[in-house]
Amino acid sequence: MPSHPNFIFRWIGLFSDKFRRQTTGIDENSNLQINGGDSSSSGSDETPVLSSVECYACTQVGVPAFHSTSCDQAHAPEWRASAGSSLVPIQEGSVPNPARTRFRRLKGPFGEVLDPRSKRVQRWNRALLLARGMALAVDPLFFYALSIGRTTGPACLYMDGAFAAVVTVLRTCLDAVHLWHVWLQFRLAYVSRESLVVGCGKLVWDPRAIASHYARSLTGFWFDVIVILPVPQAVFWLVVPKLIREEKVKLIMTILLLIFLFQFLPKIYHCICLMRRMQKVTGYIFGTIWWGFALNLIAYFIASHVAGGCWYVLAIQRVASCIRQQCMRTGNCNLSLACKEEVCYQFVSPTSTVGYPCLSGNLTSVVNKPMCLDSNGPFRYGIYRWALPVISSNSLAVKILYPIFWGLMTLSTFANDLEPTSNWLEVIFSIVMVLSGLLLFTLLIGNIQVFLHAVMAKKRKMQIRCRDMEWWMKRRQLPSRLRQRVRRFERQRWNALGGEDELELIHDLPPGLRRDIKRYLCFDLINKVPLFRGMDDLILDNICDRAKPRVFSKDEKIIREGDPVQRMIFIMRGRVKRIQSLSKGVLATSTLEPGGYLGDELLSWCLRRPFLDRLPPSSATFVCLENIEAFSLGSEDLRYITDHFRYKFANERLKRTARYYSSNWRTWAAVNIQMAWRRRRKRTRGENIGGSMSPVSENSIEGNSERRLLQYAAMFMSIRPHDHLE
């Protein structure tokens, strides 16, 4: 007689062969109809209807992504649908012929084959991970179904049937979720081991191979079966009531702890394997740092929950031992540790009942019950003395929360507060708690510290930079004025950029993605600049791709008059003062508002033909009146844009806009307007005076001539700008 695993494998193989024959027969009939009765497509071939030619994605080398072992024509690559030109039109590939693609879907006996990289499978894996975490938290709740009754009569052991029923329903629902996961595993494509030798791995899409691979894997199907076996439910409803009637308390505790560890440890391993698979396929689990922080915190909480549950069960065993010892000392003791109803449903008991509704009255001589439930009594409880009021409490909240608190406190302090007795089981449990505390602190708390460090890394980086800067300024003995300027600039850059170099963050991204990100960040700001408001989207995309953010602190000089202009700066926030020397002692000042720009000498330098390599000098000094946020275009970037889109910069409207907002043109225009106004005023005054001339008027004429010379000097110093836009 074949073994049970071989029988299952044989059944899966026969079922897959039958389904494949049916699918192959249908596809052959469809091929006959499509090809007009071509006999070459018919026959007894039982191979799946799949092309032997590998798809384009499978033949590429580069990013380690999983590819299929065969080209699925029903799911053509997206790049093929988007390819086309004016000579080769794009064909409508989104509506395939149903007669040809309906029978090419990869289906098996368990349903359609799923791609592990799909969003659907990723969402299901996250939901399963949360369900497995809930299952880890539900299993220790079975321990709290056991309790010791405490009234004016004797103490007895019973099982809270109502609470056990609730926990059983929760556990069964979570096992049903895992059972659905097992069903999906029979449909989920896997990576072929042979394909990992050379290349980046290929997915196996054959339904029969997928089912066979999952069923034969010890860490696959059989491991999942062990995890979802309803062992705790069966033990609590079939075994525990019988053992309570037989008063085998030690055997009850031993069975509970062994069964718990038999399923709890595999569940932990299953969760770890699931998280590793999710990280291997997608590179992340939930995608944010805070989710990782929460997962580690939940794991630490579950570990405390498990430790508290084991502590609760072992405390019940010690109380039962105390009651037996007290009974043996009395001589005439007919003790029954079991209550009259070993399974008691407190939720449906009459409310008029004082205390517990199911207590035993089978004690002929009264045992001093408070002595065994008193932590200050003669019986030494060791580490279980704080559990005495918990195991006899009628409140489920107290029974669940206090052991969790004890577990958190014990694991966090490495069991420093534990004072065990000479009982060997108590000593072993204390050793396990110490080792568990060290292990959890090393793994989970260490991971939490890593996440917190990642969150606080930017702030810490800022603090280290400020400390190093202060040390350097102190070592170089910089004056307090310069130190204050450095501190002001560092604070402003931190407030504006958050301590991050935006260009460095997106530097390694693909060009298309980087361009889209910079367009999203800079497009609205660039549109506010009047010079770029009427340009094409293609030019704006190139400007956004080459724009760099800049920050300047108050009272800082952006550029001095006469210095080479290395970049064109566009002001987004703040005001800039422009100072230009017209002659000795004569300064022309103006203010640039948000939307203005400086360094327009580069624009004429880029458009000039023949081209000169020497950068143009700045015609003015620019000083920040406020904290400035801007973006800049370097000389090479601006030259690239003007060379490739010169047709746009020859536009008459753009020429007028550039001259209107240019600080150089505005200064030149202001000087010429003032000169013309003064000439007109002088001419009108001369007409009013007539021909009368006195010595006083002669002196005034000489003074006017000196002023006229200064005005002409200012006019000639303010040379008409050359923007080469004609």
Swiss-Prot record:
A nucleoside 3',5'-cyclic phosphate binds at residues 531-661. Signal peptide: none annotated. It comes from the Eukaryota. Residues 645-661 are annotated as: Calmodulin-binding. Expressed in the whole plant but only weakly in roots. Strongly expressed in the expanded cotyledons of 14-day-old seedlings and detected later in leaves after the transition to flowering. Also detected in flowers during organ senescence and in the dehiscence zone of siliques. One of its GO terms (molecular function) is inward rectifier potassium channel activity. The chain crosses the membrane at residues 128-148, 163-183, 220-240, 255-275, 283-303, 425-445. Induction: Up-regulated by light. Transiently induced during leaf and culture senescence. GO terms for biological process: calcium ion import; defense response; nitric oxide mediated signal transduction; plant-type hypersensitive response. InterPro entries: cNMP-bd_dom (IPR000595), cNMP-bd_dom_sf (IPR018490), RmlC-like_jellyroll (IPR014710). Loss-of-function mutations cngc2-1 (dnd1-1) or cncg2-2 results in the loss of the hypersensitive response and leads to a broad spectrum disease resistance. These mutations lead to a specific and dramatic calcium hypersensitivity that results in severe reductions in plant size and seed yield. Homotetramer or heterotetramer (Potential). Binds calmodulin-1/4 with a higher affinity than calmodulin-2/3/5. The binding of calmodulin to the C-terminus might interfere with cyclic nucleotide binding and thus channel activation. This is Cyclic nucleotide-gated ion channel 2.
